[in-house]
């Protein structure tokens, strides 16, 4: 977060940070000076803050490394994982479930589109796959409501959907093994 967050991240990441907005997220990577991937992530904006979603096993090392380059930038790099919860939903009836939960009609089939409601951010990957982002305070009520219409299957299923969608996930074991252009980020 901070007033220099976007320019700072633009100089550090492989993606065009200027393309993210309150309505659009994107995938990117954080690389070594030689261009090898240290992390792959999902990046989006909420209010004036940029959020980077990456594997928990890389969080501390990426946060520490980015902090080294802050210098005089008006940027704060913090771990928000105790504040926000992500829930993935997938299936043929996701659009109907979205409408039931939010009371809104899904108006965009553009991938990586974000819709914000009072309590939930909805990241639309496709008509059949979404991620809900909510506060830890709101998560139990949202989970209860979702459970009335959907069956919890766990992170393994979500990881499989990521693989099937061609979304690269860099883990500690695969750091520096890939270049972003080989992984479409």
Regions flagged by a language model, labelled:
Residues 1-184:
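Basic, glycine/lysine-rich polyanion-binding surfaces/domains
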């Amino acid at each position: 977060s901070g007033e220099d967050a976007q320019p700072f991240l633009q100089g550090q990441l492989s993606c065009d940070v200027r393309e993210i907005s309150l309505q659009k997220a994107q995938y990117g990577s954080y690389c070594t000076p030689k261009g090898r991937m240290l992390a792959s992530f999902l990046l989006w904006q909420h209010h004036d803050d940029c959020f980077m979603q990456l594997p928990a096993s890389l969080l501390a090392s990426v946060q520490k490394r980015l902090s080294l380059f802050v210098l005089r930038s008006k940027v704060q790099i913090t771990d928000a994982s105790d504040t926000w919860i992500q829930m993935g939903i997938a299936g043929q009836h996701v659009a109907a479930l979205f409408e039931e939960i939010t009371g809104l009609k899904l108006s965009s089939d553009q991938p990586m589109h974000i819709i914000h409601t009072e309590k939930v951010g909805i990241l639309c990957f496709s008509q059949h796959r979404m991620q809900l982002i909510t506060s830890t305070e709101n998560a139990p009520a949202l989970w209860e409501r979702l459970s009335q219409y959907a069956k919890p299957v766990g992170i393994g299923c979500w990881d499989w959907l990521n693989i099937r969608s061609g979304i690269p996930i860099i883990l500690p074991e695969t750091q520096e093994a890939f270049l972003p252009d080989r992984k479409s980020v």
